[in-house]
Each structure stands twice: as C-alpha cells, then as structure tokens.
C-alpha cells in the first residue's frame, strides 16, 4: 500500500543530517541506520548505508533506480533455507 500524496515523503530527520554531513565531507564512510522506513531521496545517490535487518547491518549502495523506495526494501529480514529433500 502506497503512502498518501498529501502526507508527502518521509525520511528520519537524524538520517537527513547524516546524509548532509556525508555529502559535505570527502570520506565515503557508510552511514549506519536503523531507520528502514525512510524513503530514498535523490541526494542519497552514491552513498552507502548500513541498514539494520534486526540482527546485523547490511550494506546498501544507493543508485538512481532506488529513488522513491524505502531503505528497508533492500535489507531482507527473513532468510529462507530450502526444504531438505527426503532421502530414499
């Protein structure tokens, strides 16, 4: 279900501060965040985020195709292990 247009896009204010600081600096250190609900904006392109999946932080490199999506979409929380085949 998509977000209402009258509400607008959402990004955590502390995450926006970190992005502005990263864009101003030369170092390309990953930005660690727990905010999976934040939407990806155009000024995030080219940055690397460490998104928490509930257990560990997964590195996500943001490209232009990701704009408008949420950070959490690129850090899966569940890992499916294949069903074992019955031995005969």
From Swiss-Prot:
Alphabetized GO MF terms: rRNA binding; structural constituent of ribosome
Coiled coil: none
Record PROSITE patterns: RIBOSOMAL_S19
Pfam families assigned to the protein according to its UniProt record, in alphabetical order: Ribosomal_S19
Leader sequence segment: none
InterPro entries reported in the protein's UniProt record: Ribosomal_uS19 (IPR002222), Ribosomal_uS19_bac-type (IPR005732), Ribosomal_uS19_CS (IPR020934), Ribosomal_uS19_SF (IPR023575)
GO BP: ribosomal small subunit assembly; translation
GO cellular component terms, A-Z: cytoplasm; small ribosomal subunit
Keywords: Ribonucleoprotein, Ribosomal protein, RNA-binding, rRNA-binding
Role of this protein: Protein S19 forms a complex with S13 that binds strongly to the 16S ribosomal RNA.
HAMAP family from the UniProt entry: Ribosomal_uS19
PANTHER family for the chain: RIBOSOMAL PROTEIN S19P FAMILY MEMBER, SMALL RIBOSOMAL SUBUNIT PROTEIN US19M
NCBIfam families: rpsS_bact
Record-stated family: Belongs to the universal ribosomal protein uS19 family.
Protein name in the entry: Small ribosomal subunit protein uS19
Gene this chain is encoded by: rpsS
